[in-house]
């Protein structure tokens, strides 16, 4: 069995003191470390390919912050690693800052620029550079709280928007890592091939619930080394994800 490691970042910026914002230099150190250990970077959609290398790394980004294009794209470009960004399509190109639970008015004030989503033109540039653009639903809701009709709209409309602009959309990341069997079944019906979960809630990887490791500013290099080690990753899966090195919500 291949060793598949999927990382989840959010904003990549030195300017926003928030638990979702990782410094670009930290991103570069972390990915370089894994490349030295023999991992090969690939898009999230490709991690289950039968022809892939024995050690596979997918670097993913949730929410589509503009800082991903500004800072993460050049970092991963230098390292020869394609990224995957999951975008809430209702926010793409909006001049308004995005707003999630935990981001209060004070954060939206001085750091409003950091909370804006990329434009379709920026996403097209990422795709041109070999990145994958996946869905993070339309409006970023807790999917398990949606009724069946709203759930289908969130999954289908976001995928359709990406397909219309970029030609393809095979993958999904659940907002807040919030999923269950009903949501996963709806994701498959909506046409997704692979979906990312965070935090780890499943006992084993599954196409509609693939585990990721959330990476945050607190993950300095020694902690990052521990977090990505195979024994710790295996323990997190056995314990259901939240009991070891607990992470903020996505």
Task: Give the location of each predicted region.
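Acidic (Asp/Glu)-rich catalytic clusters
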Residues: 1, 35-36, 74-80, 118-135, ...
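Aromatic- and acidic-residue-enriched segments that line the glycan-binding/catalytic groove
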Residues: 93-113
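Histidine-centered divalent metal-coordination motifs
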Residues: 10, 136, 140
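Solvent-exposed loop/turn segments at secondary-structure junctions
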Residues: 65-66, 90-93, 139-141, 178-179
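C-terminal active-site subregion of NodB/CE4 polysaccharide deacetylases
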Residues: 1-60, 66-71, 145-250
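Generic beta-sheet signal
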Residues: 86-88, 136, 197-198
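Generic enzyme active-site microenvironment
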Residues: 60-61, 134
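A short alpha/beta connector and helix-capping loop motif
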Residues: 71-89
């Amino acid at each position: 069995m291949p060793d598949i490691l999927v990382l989840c970042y959010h904003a990549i910026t030195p300017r926003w003191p928030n638990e979702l914002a990782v410094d670009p230099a930290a991103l570069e150190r972390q990915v370089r470390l894994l490349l030295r250990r023999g991992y090969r970077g690939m898009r999230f959609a490709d991690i289950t390919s039968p022809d892939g290398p024995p050690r596979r790394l997918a670097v993913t980004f949730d929410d589509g912050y503009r800082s991903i294009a500004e800072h993460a794209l050049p970092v991963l470009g230098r390292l020869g690693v394609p990224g995957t960004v999951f975008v809430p399509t209702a926010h793409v190109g909006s001049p308004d800052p995005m707003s999630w639970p935990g981001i209060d008015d004070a954060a939206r004030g001085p750091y409003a620029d950091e909370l804006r989503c990329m434009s379709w033109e920026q996403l097209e540039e990422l795709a041109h550079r070999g990145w994958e653009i996946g869905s993070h639903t339309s409006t970023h809701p807790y999917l398990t709280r949606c009724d069946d009709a709203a759930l289908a709209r969130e999954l289908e409309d976001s995928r359709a928007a990406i397909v219309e602009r970029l030609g393809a959309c095979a993958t999904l990341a659940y907002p807040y890592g919030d999923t269950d069997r009903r949501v996963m079944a709806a994701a498959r019906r909506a046409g997704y091939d692979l979906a990312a979960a965070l935090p780890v809630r499943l006992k084993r990887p599954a196409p509609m619930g693939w585990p990721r490791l959330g990476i945050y500013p607190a993950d300095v290099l020694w902690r990052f080394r521990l977090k990505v080690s195979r024994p710790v990753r295996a323990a997190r899966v056995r314990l259901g994800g939240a009991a070891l090195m607990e992470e903020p919500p996505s």
